Structure formats: C-alpha cells, structure tokens
C-alpha cells in the first residue's frame, strides 16, 4: 500500500490543468520559433521564454495539446502540424524550443515531416531515452487511466515509443537541470536528475551541444541563463555558457 500511496502523491504533485494560450506574433523578424510544452502542462508554462524570443524579433507560436488524451504521433499531426503550416511556412527559418516531453513530440514530428526551412531545435529537460518516473507510474492501472497513453510512451524500456524514434537528423542542443524539489521522484531516478528526468537519459549521441544548469525540471524554462543560452543556440548552434 505504501508504494501506491507514493504513486498517488507523485501523480498529484505533477498534475496541472491545461489552458489555451493564443499565439503571439512579432513580424520584425523573418524567423519563426515554435514552442511545445511537456506532459501535463500547457503553453502558458512557456510564456516567459516565448516573450524572451519575441523581444529579439522572432515570430513566436505556441502548440497546445491534450497530453492526457492523445498519443505523441497524434499530437504531432493534430496540433503541431497546423501551427507550423499556418504560421511559419513563409519564414526563412523555423526553429523549435521544447520542454520535457515536447522534445519527444518534435523528434517524431521532424522525423515524419521534412521542413525545407528548418532551423535549430533547443530541447529543455527532454526524456530522450525515457523517464524512470514514467516507468514507476505506469505500473498502476488507475494512474495509467488518469494520465493517458503518453505515459507508457515515455518509458525507458527499449521497446517504448521514445526509444523507437532513432537518432535525430536535425541540429539540436539539450539544456538539462540537476536540481530537484521532488524527493519522491528523485528516489525513483537512479542518477543525477531534475526531479522528473535523469541527466543521462536526456542525452543522445549526436547532440550539437549540451548545457547543465542548477535548475529544476518545472522551472527550467523560466531561468534567465536558460533563455539566454537557448537564444544563443538558435542563433549560432552553440549554447552561451557562464564563465
């Protein structure tokens, strides 16, 4: 019973209500940034980093999706594709900034849809090789029912959806935190982690750059140093690192 109790506590600690957030546009730049939120989140959680890119003249657009309802492939087709087609087709470059499972969504999307004007991708805290927290929660049928099909897709099993995607064929960098506010999740994760994803499992072999910061999973995208580093990567293909 104790393990079920911990699972329920963990579920409520990460659940948030989704809400709509209309795309914001700034046409001073002819480059587009598409922001994709993570599991159990909404586009409002990326508002600060979106505003940061707006300040530098990028056209910024948000993808909102129902992570408790849709599988990752459905999210790509139903939610990401229309945002890209409607808002970014005539831009010189289309960049992506993602948080958490949003990184898995964009990996699938860019594996299926080849954009001739694709720029660079920044993944914030992506479970690129799965999450032990997803493994733990998916043991419980009630949690599976409440959280939907994406939960198992984010598992660390070699046969899981995320581990079937292969190595990305686009230019991307990963920013990962190594601080946690969630001791329960961090007990589940065997390595250094951000409270949701292990540092090791955020990495893939062909990353263009990697940056580790002392931030938590939930608030990583709100940190000034992360916003600055993300912009620098979009512009140069490298992260701006503190001395």
Feature map (PLM): residue ranges:
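Sec-dependent N-terminal signal peptides
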Residues: 3-12
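A short loop-to-beta-strand scaffold at the N-terminal edge of the catalytic core in hydrolase folds
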Residues: 21-23
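Proline/glycine-enriched tight loop/beta-turn segments at coil->beta junctions
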Residues: 25-32
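Serine-dependent carboxylesterase/thioesterase catalytic core
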Residues: 33-39, 44, 53-66, 72-169
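Histidine-bearing beta->alpha loop at or near hydrolase active sites
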Residues: 65-70, 214-218
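Helical cap/lid subdomain of alpha/beta-hydrolase-fold lipid enzymes
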Residues: 111-243
């Amino acid at each position: 019973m104790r393990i079920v109790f911990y699972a329920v506590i963990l579920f409520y600690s990460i659940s948030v209500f989704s809400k709509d957030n209309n795309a914001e546009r700034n046409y001073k730049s002819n480059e587009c940034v598409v922001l994709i939120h993570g599991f159990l989140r909404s586009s409002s959680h990326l508002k600060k980093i979106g505003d940061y890119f707006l300040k530098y003249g990028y056209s910024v657009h948000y993808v909102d999706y129902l992570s408790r309802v849709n599988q990752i492939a459905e999210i790509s087709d139903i939610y990401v594709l229309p945002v890209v087609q409607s808002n970014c087709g005539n831009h010189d470059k289309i960049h992506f900034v993602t948080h958490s499972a949003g990184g898995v969504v964009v990996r699938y999307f860019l594996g299926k849809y080849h954009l001739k004007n694709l720029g660079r991708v920044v993944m914030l805290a992506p479970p690129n090789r799965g999450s032990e927290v997803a493994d733990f929660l998916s043991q419980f049928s009630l949690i599976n029912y409440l959280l939907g099909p994406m939960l198992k897709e984010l598992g660390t099993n070699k046969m899981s959806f995320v581990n079937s995607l292969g190595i990305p064929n686009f230019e991307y960098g990963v920013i990962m935190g190594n601080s946690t506010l969630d001791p329960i999740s961090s007990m589940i994760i065997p390595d250094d982690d951000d409270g949701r994803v292990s540092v090791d499992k955020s990495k893939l072999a062909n990353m263009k750059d990697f940056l580790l910061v002392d931030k938590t999973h939930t608030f990583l995208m709100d940190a000034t140093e992360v916003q600055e580093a993300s912009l620098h990567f979009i512009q140069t293909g490298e992260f701006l690192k503190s001395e």
